[in-house]
Each structure stands twice: as C-alpha cells, then as structure tokens.
C-alpha cells in the first residue's frame, strides 16, 4: 500500500479527502498505482509510485507526483479506474484544486462539472470575542465515549442534503477520533436550555491551519444566528495557538453559508470541482 501522505505538498490542496483515507485504511476502497517511470534517484532507489488513484463509492480521486507530471500518468490512472469491473468503475471524480491538467482530462473523457467546493480562509483573530450564547444555552467540549450518538444524530439532520458529511457513520467518527489531529476540546457542543444538542463546531488543527471541519445547526433552529455563535466560539478557540490562518470548506452554491462566512472575514483560497461522467 503506498503512503498517500507522501503525495501531500505544502502549496497544493490535499489530493484525497479524509473519508477516502478512512476507507483506504479500512479496506473499503480500490487503490491503483502507477509505478515509478524513472530508473531511480542518484542512489538508484525508486522514489515510489508516480501516481495513485483511489476509487470509493463510485468516486475517483487521483494524484501524480510533481516530478512525474506531464508524462500521461494521470490519463493511465483514469483508464485503469474506468476499466474496473463489477460496477466499481467511477461515475464521479474530484479535482482538488481544479488544475488545468484535471480539466484537460475531464474534457478528454467528456466529464462535466457538477459541484464546486470552495476553501475559504481568514486570519486568526488576535483575541477572541464573546460568542453571544442564547440565554440558557451552554457550550462544552465533546466527550469521547459519551457524545458520539448525540453528535451523529445532529450531524445527519444538519447535513441531510450533503452527500459526504451527512452520511458519516459511527465507524467514520471513531476513525477520526483516532487521527493525530483530533482533540475533543476542538469539537464544541452547543446545548439549549433543555440540554438538547442544538449545534456544534468541529475544528481540525493541523499543519498551521485551523479548519472549521464541520459547523452544524439543528434544522429547527437554523436561521436564528446560531451559526454565527458557533463560528465566533470556534475562532476564539483558535486564538493564541500560533496558526497561520483559519479555513473552511463550503459548497459553491450555498449562498446562506457563504454570506455567513464572508461576514466573518473569510475569502476564497482554493476550489475543488466534482466532475460527472456522461450518461
């Protein structure tokens, strides 16, 4: 199994989603490798595969090592993915960063863009502000081993229309709790006066970036400003941790969320595009 983390480079978006990494480790994804096309480095040792593709649940993600680009590696990986039998061939593909090479491959195979996912960034504030909790509400850290079921129910309801986030399972959540970046104190739970979970703000702090991993508000409470409350609470949590920026991902057509984040000082940093195969 190739080290997928070895394909991450500092100035490019991560080539694989967290869910893809979880599924690869769990053996729920197909991993394709294109071998090193060069005899090796100065010491005669190959640098590893030139490229890797991951296919899971009908979706394709792939990456080509920077030094191996321009040699047709991406095209060969796509061809191999499309040749998978047993219904495993992908019908969707993600281009993280939407590079010209990805667009060229999509055009070659007649794949059309169907979704955009925007990465927004903002400076980390120098001081936190009062989040403005509603009367009777409380904000507390997630308790591993205790809060999973409550949070999963909230997440499923809040993201019912989101293909990836809303389908998170207990196994998916536990896999993320096992990640080095996970900290229960960075998953803030907002409860209403009755003690019921009203919302949550999950932060992923890694490589100098404080990402708003998932901000969820219970559907019956949406439109009441709780998203802003959670955003302010999350930003306050990032203060003083030596981070370069705070970041988040949002669907390109989610205008209410985009408006909230822009009011919070976020601007576009990168874009991911999902392509669909022709019918």
Label each region the model flagged.
Residues 1-9, 138-153:
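A short beta-loop-alpha structural element at the N-terminal edge
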Residues 20-26, 53-58, 164, 168-216:
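A conserved beta-strand-loop-helix scaffold within acyl/acetyltransferase catalytic domains
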Residues 35-36, 42-43, 49, 56-59, ...:
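Acyl-donor-binding surface of acyltransferase catalytic domains
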Residues 58-71, 215-222, 251:
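A short, internal acetyl-CoA/4′-phosphopantetheine-binding micro-motif in the GNAT/acyltransferase core
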Residues 60-62, 91-95, 212, 246-250:
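Conserved hydrophobic beta-strand within the GNAT/NAT acetyltransferase core sheet
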Residues 70-84, 217, 223-240, 258-263:
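Conserved acetyl-CoA-binding loop-helix of GNAT-fold acetyltransferases
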Residues 75-76, 97-116, 223-224, 228, ...:
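Conserved active-site alpha-helix within GNAT-family acetyltransferase domains
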Residues 119-143, 247-255, 265, 271-279:
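C-terminal "cap" of GNAT-fold acetyltransferases
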